[in-house]
């Protein structure tokens, strides 16, 4: 008997809707990353993208504990001398709240082509409206 390995053509991928309102940022990101990896499925295979599609709404209403709103910083470098841009988590949540959750989940996924394919299945939106009603996502309570 041989060990089962999933094939990319035969993997069943479902669509799930997650409401981020009142959820802790890190705990939500961890569960989203596990679902994108496919670790919640019995057919999980490390070298095959077995994860589901995730639609996250109300990203601006995510919660953080402690003083992270003022003490946690995101840095990005423009490539020019002296242009290291920094902004706190509070500022980032005001400017682009969906990106905060995307960065948290992306850091938990593999670095490489497979990780990028998994990351593309994450759809994050501010507010409760999303353009994926045609896929009929199932509500997922995390």
From Swiss-Prot:
Per the record, what is one GO cellular component? cytosolic large ribosomal subunit
Example GO biological process term?
translation
Superkingdom is Bacteria
Matches recorded under Pfam families? Ribosomal_L13
Keywords assigned: Ribonucleoprotein, Ribosomal protein
- Keyword Ribonucleoprotein in the entry? The reply is yes
Record-annotated membrane-spanning stretches: none
**Its Gene Ontology molecular function terms?**
mRNA binding; structural constituent of ribosome
Annotated HAMAP family: Ribosomal_uL13
Family from the record: Belongs to the universal ribosomal protein uL13 family.
Q: What does this protein do?
A: This protein is one of the early assembly proteins of the 50S ribosomal subunit, although it is not seen to bind rRNA by itself. It is important during the early stages of 50S assembly.
Q: What is its quaternary makeup?
A: Part of the 50S ribosomal subunit.
> Would you tell me the protein name for this molecule?
Large ribosomal subunit protein uL13
Gene name, Swiss-Prot/TrEMBL? rplM
